[in-house]
């Protein structure tokens, strides 16, 4: 491991036990359209992990629900989802041994690259007292994981 200078983590299911949290939040947000459509959005989320909520809600509104259906629009879905997820991320389990792994990798930069909302991730990790571990930064949507990684590599923040 002596040649490794950075470790890049995903958030959901890696650092935080939060995969089910987001599935439940997507379901809850879509429930005003009915259980059938809420289940369809939750299933779409599961099948398309790592894609931003912006894209998932746009897909839901444009491709899943029928034209003229009554229910919350894009901004309301986004706001409800953000509130629900943030509340649950503040309470979910943190990966066991994270602190001891950080201690064993002192000389390496830690980064988070996630499909989650970047501002929300920074706020949650700050409020949970975990932000200091990620000295390389905490990155998320609206940019995709691929775009974030390309930028970090091109700016020599991650060396391969």
Give the residues covered by each predicted segment.
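A short, structured active-site edge motif that brings together acidic residues
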Residues: 44-45, 74-75, 130-145
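Conserved hydrophobic residues forming the short capping helix/wall of the S-adenosyl-L-methionine
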Residues: 30, 61, 125, 129, ...
């Amino acid at each position: 491991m002596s040649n490794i200078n950075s470790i890049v983590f995903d958030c959901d299911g890696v650092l935080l036990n939060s995969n089910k949290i987001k599935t439940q939040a997507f379901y809850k947000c879509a429930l005003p359209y009915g259980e059938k459509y809420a289940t369809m959005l939750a299933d779409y989320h599961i099948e398309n992990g790592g894609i931003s909520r912006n894209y998932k809600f746009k897909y839901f509104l444009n491709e899943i629900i029928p034209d003229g259906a009554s229910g919350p629009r894009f901004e309301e879905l986004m706001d409800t989802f953000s509130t629900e997820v943030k509340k649950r991320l503040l309470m979910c389990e943190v990966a066991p041994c994270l602190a001891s792994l950080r201690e064993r990798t002192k000389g390496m930069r830690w980064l988070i690259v996630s499909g989650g909302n970047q501002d929300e991730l920074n706020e949650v990790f700050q409020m949970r007292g975990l932000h200091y571990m990620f000295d390389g930064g905490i990155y998320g949507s609206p940019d995709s994981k691929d775009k974030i990684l390309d930028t970090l590599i091109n700016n020599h923040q991650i060396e391969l």
